[in-house]
Amino acid sequence: MYKRVLLKLSGEVLSGEDQKGFNEEHVEYLIKEIKGISEYGTKLGIVIGAGNIFRGRDFEGLRPTISDQIGMLGTVINALYLKDRFENAGIRTVIVSQIVTLPSVKLINYDDIDLYFDAGYVVIFAGGTSNPFFTTDTGAALRAVEMKAELLIKGTKVCGIYDKDPKKYSDAKKYNVITYDEAIEKNLKIMDTEAFSICKRYNMKILVMNFFENGNLLKAIKGENVGTLVVPKV
């Protein structure tokens, strides 16, 4: 059983693929999955992307720094939305960020993070790394290390990591466990380079799994065989 976990989700978890805004069915599913682990006492941090709010690639003419700042603010919007929905469902939630302080958003202080966890809060990390040119994957890797997580879960639409695209190749092989060095050698795109290097440097386990399969989050927390686990060595 993992006691301290960082969950990284894309904004599409809230909206559906290639959609904008919030899809009620998807949000209710997320709430159900989070509630499903609440009785086990796992301290949970969440990093959510902003693809359902804003994608810089959809807008030509924006400077990358401005595009990235809009994306960071998009993660704050998602965090505020989730906090309200979570709390309406009985999930105590706090938002922390390095870029925005609002009545419902606290400035990151890692002494306080431990207090929030001990009090039973889910902690949503908003605003990415607070710097442009870094993805929310990198933000998730940083927050996972900073909150002393035992596992970083990357919730996706696929069942794990494959040797080739399973949508294109029927003989694609799924890895149950793979090392960092193997993943680099095989050029498997698990996270962006910066995020992956942070996890490798600090021996952070990464679990890539299908978030949309009922009960997978609880299975992951329990350490059951789900998705693909990336480890320092086997």
Curated annotation (Swiss-Prot):
It comes from Fervidobacterium nodosum (strain ATCC 35602 / DSM 5306 / Rt17-B1). Belongs to the UMP kinase family. The lineage of its organism: Bacteria, Thermotogati, Thermotogota, Thermotogae, Thermotogales. Pathway: Pyrimidine metabolism; CTP biosynthesis via de novo pathway; UDP from UMP (UMPK route): step 1/1. ATP binds at K8, L9, S10, G11, G51, R55, T156, Y162, D165. It catalyses: UMP + ATP = UDP + ADP. Inhibited by UTP. SUPFAM superfamilies: Carbamate kinase-like. GO terms for molecular function: ATP binding; UMP kinase activity. NCBIfam families: pyrH_bact. InterPro entries: AceGlu_kinase-like_sf (IPR036393), Asp/Glu/Uridylate_kinase (IPR001048), Uridylate_kinase (IPR011817), Uridylate_kinase_bac (IPR015963). The keyword Cytoplasm applies. Disulfide bonds: none annotated. This is Uridylate kinase. UMP binds at D68, T129, S130, N131, P132, F133, F134, T135, T136. Catalyzes the reversible phosphorylation of UMP to UDP. GO terms for cellular component: cytoplasm.
